[in-house]
Amino acid sequence: MAEYCDIYNEAGTHLGTALRSECHGNPALIHCTAHVVVIHPENGMVLLQKRRMDKDIQPGRWDTAVGGHLAAGESFEEAARRELSEELGVSGRVELFHLFDSRIRNEIESENVRVFGAKLSGPFDFQRSEIDEVRFFSAAELTDPANRQNFTPNLCTELDELIRSGFIRS
C-alpha cells in the first residue's frame, strides 16, 4: 500500500501530498517526522535503536529510539504514538512531552522534526524487521566521541540540542 506524506514549503504552507518514497531522495519535498526520545524513569539513561544492516539510510548505526514520517493528515503526536507502538511495541497511555522542533536539510531529504520525550523502562518488543537492537545509553556514552562515530548524523544533532538545553548532562 502506498504511503503518502503531506509536503510543505519553507514557510510551512501545505502544498499537497507526495509518496513517502518520493520524499527520500528529493530534498525539495519538505515533509514532517516525529521522534521520541525514550528516557529511563529511574536513571535518566536514553534508549537508542540500532538500525538493521539492510536499511537504505544509515544501516547498522545507532539512532533515536523512535522516529517516523507523518502520514498525510496525521498530527505529530499521532505519529509519535503510532511509531512507539510499531517500533517498540509500546501502546496504551504514555505521557509524551514536547522537547523541541528542528529542521533536517541534506542531500537526501528535508524534514521538519518534532521531538518528544517519554519516560519508559521497558520491556520493549521492538520491530525486528527494522531494528537490530535497542539499549539504554548513559550520558557519558552518548557524549563519547568513539561512540558517536556509530551514531546517525541526525541522532548526533538531536543529542547536541538535548545537551545544549541541559536535558542531557555531559
Where are the language model's segments positioned?
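Residues that flank catalytic or metal-binding motifs in active/ligand-binding sites
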Residues: 3, 32-34, 66, 112, ...
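Conserved Nudix-box catalytic region and its N-terminal flanking loop in Nudix hydrolases
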Residues: 23-33, 42-82, 86
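Acidic, metal-coordinating catalytic segment for phosphate/diphosphate chemistry
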Residues: 1-35, 39-42
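Short, structured loop/turn "capping" segments at alpha-beta junctions
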Residues: 90-97
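Nudix hydrolase/Nudix homology domain
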Residues: 22, 60-62, 72, 98-103, ...
